[in-house]
Each structure stands twice: as C-alpha cells, then as structure tokens.
UniProtKB/Swiss-Prot annotation:
This is Cell division topological specificity factor. Belongs to the MinE family. NCBIfam families: minE, PRK00296.1. InterPro entries: MinE, MinE_sf. Keywords: Cell cycle, Cell division. It holds the Pfam family MinE. Prevents the cell division inhibition by proteins MinC and MinD at internal division sites while permitting inhibition at polar sites. This ensures cell division at the proper site by restricting the formation of a division septum at the midpoint of the long axis of the cell. The gene is minE. It comes from Buchnera aphidicola subsp. Acyrthosiphon pisum (strain 5A). GO terms for biological process: cell division; regulation of division septum assembly.
Length: 83
C-alpha cells in the first residue's frame, strides 16, 4: 500500500503544480487582455520620443498599465539608461 500511496500523492502534487502554473498563465493573459486598444500605439510613441533624446535599445524600456480600481489606472514606465 505504501507504494500505491506514493504514486497517488505524487499525482496530487503534480496536479497542484500544473494548476498553479495554469493560474499564472491565465493571470498573465488577463493582464494583457485588459489593456485598452490604444495601449500598443502609446508604447510605440513613448519609445520613439525617448529614443529621440537618449540612445537606447527598445528592450531597455518597459511600459505597463495596472488597473488598481475601476476608476484608477497606473501607467508604469521603466527605462534602463546607459552609463
């Protein structure tokens, strides 16, 4: 019976791990699906303005929009500046 218990408990652990991973994936997809239609263009325009004044690669700039409440959104801009 111990052998059977070992395999059954492992399946539960594997199922829990798979469930947690799926929840992370779904949360990430929801995060990007909730973006307004104008957001990709906003990202491109912000990047072009920054590149006008500072010589940086596009992957050095991240723009995120977080919805805190129904009426509050936070635009977060992170830029890695060269030395």
């Amino acid at each position: 019976m111990a052998l059977l218990d070992f395999f059954l408990s492992r399946n539960k652990n594997t199922a829990n791990v798979a469930k947690e991973r799926l929840q992370i994936i779904v949360a990430e997809q929801r995060k990007y699906n909730n973006e307004p239609d104008y957001f990709p263009q906003l990202k491109r325009e912000i990047l072009s303005v920054i590149c006008k004044y500072v010589n940086i690669e596009p992957n050095m700039v991240t723009v995120q929009l977080d919805q805190k409440k129904e009426d509050i959104s936070i635009l977060e801009l992170n830029i890695i500046l060269p030395d």
